[in-house]
């Protein structure tokens, strides 16, 4: 009772407006914003020598957003440790996630994906209408990832860098087994009940009772099993254990112990707050992902060199070898990153990709949600049904994906071109859709219909 009374009397409000970004020191006393601009336009001239004025305007726009949102140092910090990696022969991935939509990142060699050629949108990464920390997901050779982290620790000080805690939560089956053990129920009986829970991603006990007749019957036939499931439902989703995040590293302007509580986890120092809380507190979180596929690529290139053959340059390779596409279309993709699962191989044999765009679309389709589009996409791609569009304005947006909405960028382009949204506002719609915010989507549905009518498009579309 006293604890509750004290809690009710406390009115502390955390002020999280401050960003704890570490400072970057540009050489020769140059202002950081000027140095970032210099690096970007040097890369722009090198990578896009034939670019038109609209491309330069986009880079100018991105730089103004980066500066106005206070993320100049962030871009320079990321550029610096990626530059270190590349100078020291550490293979770095070409870029993944929303960061690949930044032309500035492409010009800085943070990513190797041309966002203009691939129709990627900067506002999905950095939105002036939604103030949040940017987040580059960066892959490094698995065996040399630690060298990059060590460089960051050395540059910014070990008291300013820490790894991040993560909490494993009780999934449905695990909750049943743990509760059964606590209730001293026979293991065989508990295991039998646990196996009645469908082994699907994000399965909950509530949903399992709905879709598993066997589990539902057991629940309604036995008071012991009902007690087991009811207790398990209360524990489901609760933290079960703590571990160190596989890739996350936080870098702070101030000594990190002054900003968040720390703990020792094996040999590393980790934060006691998880990633989401750290971002809310304005701390810089980086994902240093160790990817074994990059290590295999490194070893392959080394082997080619030792064999006396010319080593291919990854940044100038063409993606148009028909023999490679024939191999992929046969489902012969063991060990190929993101194409090696049994389900994906089966899908590739149906899809029969003959371009790099087909592979990108295939990876995007083969996940919950877009999977519903697979039959239509495959039929249209292989000429078994015509490609149709609800409105002519959808054709340039959906042409490359045979009339199917596959990418989140396409959602943003649709609400912009048909509903009159800005790209920044269209990102808010994309985000609400991905987070399943039904109230926001209901409101935006009406806004979109009204925008359609203003653009001369029937609201029913």
What positions do the PLM features span?
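Alpha-helical scaffold/interaction cores of sigma-54-like transcription cofactors
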Residues: 1-461
């Amino acid at each position: 009772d006293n604890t509750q009374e004290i809690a009710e009397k406390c009115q502390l409000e955390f002020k999280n407006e401050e960003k704890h970004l570490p400072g970057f020191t540009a050489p020769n006393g140059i202002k950081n914003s000027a140095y970032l601009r210099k690096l970007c336009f040097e890369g722009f001239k090198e990578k896009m020598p034939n670019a038109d004025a609209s491309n330069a305007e986009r880079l100018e726009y991105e730089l103004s957003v980066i500066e106005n949102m206070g993320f100049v140092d962030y871009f320079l910090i990321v550029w610096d440790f990626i530059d270190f990696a590349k100078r020291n022969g550490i293979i770095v991935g070409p870029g993944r996630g929303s960061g690949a939509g930044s032309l500035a990142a492409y010009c800085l060699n943070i990513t190797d994906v041309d966002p203009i050629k691939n129709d990627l949108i900067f506002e999905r990464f950095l939105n002036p209408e939604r103030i949040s920390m940017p987040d580059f997901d960066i892959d490094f050779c698995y065996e040399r990832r630690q060298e990059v982290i060590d460089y960051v620790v050395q540059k910014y000080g070990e008291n300013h860098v820490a790894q991040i805690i993560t909490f494993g939560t009780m999934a449905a089956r695990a909750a049943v087994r743990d509760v059964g053990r606590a209730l001293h129920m026979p293991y065989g009986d508990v295991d039998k009940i646990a196996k009645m829970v469908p082994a699907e991603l994000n399965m909950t006990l509530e949903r399992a009772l709905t879709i598993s007749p066997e589990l539902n019957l057991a629940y309604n036939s036995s008071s012991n099993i009902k007690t087991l499931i009811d207790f398990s439902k209360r524990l489901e989703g609760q933290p079960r254990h703590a571990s160190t995040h596989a890739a996350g590293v936080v870098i702070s302007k101030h000594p990190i112990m002054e900003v968040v509580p720390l703990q020792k986890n094996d040999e590393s120092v980790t934060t006691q707050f998880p990633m989401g809380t750290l971002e809310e507190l304005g701390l810089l979180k980086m994902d240093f992902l160790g990817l074994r596929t990059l290590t295999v690529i490194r070893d392959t290139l080394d082997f080619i060199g030792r064999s006396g053959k010319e080593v291919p340059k990854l940044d100038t390779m063409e993606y148009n070898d028909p023999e490679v596409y024939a191999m992929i279309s046969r489902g012969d993709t063991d060990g190929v990153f993101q194409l090696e699962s049994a389900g994906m191989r089966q899908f590739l044999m149906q899809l029969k990709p003959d371009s790099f765009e087909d592979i990108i679309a295939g990876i995007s389709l083969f996940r919950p949600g877009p999977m519903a589009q697979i039959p239509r996409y495959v039929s249209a791609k292989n000429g078994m049904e015509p490609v149709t569009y609800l409105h002519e304005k959808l054709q340039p947006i959906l042409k490359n994906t045979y009339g199917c909405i596959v990418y989140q960028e396409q959602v943003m382009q649709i609400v912009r071109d048909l509903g009159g949204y800005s790209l920044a506002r269209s990102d808010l719609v994309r985000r609400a859709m991905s987070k399943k915010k039904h109230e926001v989507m209901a409101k935006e549905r009406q806004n979109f219909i009204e925008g359609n009518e203003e653009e001369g498009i029937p609201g029913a579309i």
